[in-house]
Amino acid sequence: MASGMRRTGRELAIKIIYSFDGTGSVEALLATFWSNFRFRDDVLGEPLEDSSQAVAEPVREFAEDLVRGVAENLEKIDGLIGEFSTNWSLERMARVDLAILRMATYELLGHLDVPVSVIINEAVEIGKRYGTKETPSFVNGILDRISRTCRPVVAS
């Protein structure tokens, strides 16, 4: 899948994860999101580029994989984020930042074929678009620490 399509999938996943509170059915959440996606604004109020155009199937599948992966591994993911976010509890974090961190942490754990630098850079870029001015450095710092523990560089 092209990198632009993966970015779109990540952005869609962030929007779904943002509304996930750890309870209820992930499948119901996905169904609700995709049914709302046809409107002119998405769940965060962002205007859709073309609200009449359906999401490409590979993009949708990638987004759903990320969402399901976060939901299935939420306790582990939140544990890692909490462990490596010095002086920040998950409850104090901005919800957008937490959604980005959850998605990227899952990708670090579950998508070993994607380079660490790509995962972190994508999270930072999405943070620039949806978060505050502090989001990119906040997300970068936590994901860097998580990646050093969960995805150490193998010496050759």
Swiss-Prot record:
Output the Pfam families linked to this UniProt entry: NusB (PF01029)
GO biological process annotations for this chain's record? DNA-templated transcription termination; transcription antitermination
Gene Ontology molecular-function annotations? RNA binding
Residue ranges spanning the membrane: these are: none
Alphabetically ordered keywords of this record: RNA-binding, Transcription, Transcription antitermination, Transcription regulation
A GO CC term attached to the entry:
cytosol
Q: Which domain of life is it from?
A: Bacteria
Cited InterPro entries? NusB-like_sf (IPR035926), NusB_fam (IPR011605), NusB_RsmB_TIM44 (IPR006027)
**Keyword check for Disulfide bond:** no
Protein purpose: Involved in transcription antitermination. Required for transcription of ribosomal RNA (rRNA) genes. Binds specifically to the boxA antiterminator sequence of the ribosomal RNA (rrn) operons.
Which family would the database say this protein is a member of?
Belongs to the NusB family.
Can you name this protein? Transcription antitermination protein NusB
Q: Gene for this protein?
A: nusB
